[in-house]
Amino acid sequence: LILIPSRLSASRLPNKPLLKINGKSIISLVVDRAKRSKLGEVIVATEDNKILNEVKKNGGNAIITSNKHKTGTDRIYECLSKLKKRNIDYIINLQGDEPNIDINDLKRLYILTKKNNSDMSTLASEIHNKKIYKDKNIVKVITNLKLNKNNFPYAKDFRRLITSGKNIYHHLGVYIYKVKILKKFINLRQSENELSNK
């Protein structure tokens, strides 16, 4: 199951999900990519009727959620709780503003997470442009090991601004959780680091 949290009231770029790229809304492009991954049903979780209508108009599925959520994770959990009982092991949380997400990366994330029986995983990529380190609009992840296809490091920290260090990567905003872990995760108190890096 791929759940896509999406809302119009983003602080950095309001109405972003409905902006068009080559005549198609960003949210519709994200839904199309998610469907092409063939990793399961794709549902957009949104508080906005405009997004709901846009998704449905383009053949997608969406569910209205509360407008009180502090995070996309809270939003997808509400969406999950509204779905009828299903046999789901993992939930992929794909951000609604990632129209260029690589389908193969989504597949690798699922395969590696399942193979390693991990409770939760996320995607990151190498940083090739040094300006990204100082760009507060791009979240960076610091890992315990150098990232490569042969290891599965864990995230030590997530930061918006960072000037130096090693094992720093561009966080791609895609998560996968075991359903039981998602249920535990949303009940945790937000850390100071999470609140300061929003």
Sequence positions of predicted segments:
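N-terminal glycine-rich phosphate-binding loop and ensuing alpha1 helix
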Residues: 1-46
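Short beta-strand segments
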Residues: 5, 93-95, 123-124
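Short, high-confidence coil segments that cap the C-terminus of an alpha-helix
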Residues: 39, 85-88, 115-119
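Short phosphate-binding loop-to-helix
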Residues: 43, 49-111
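A conserved hydrophobic position in a structured secondary element of the catalytic/binding core
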Residues: 46-47, 101, 177, 196
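Conserved core of the sugar-phosphate nucleotidyltransferase
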Residues: 101-190
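Donor nucleotide-sugar recognition loop
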Residues: 189-198
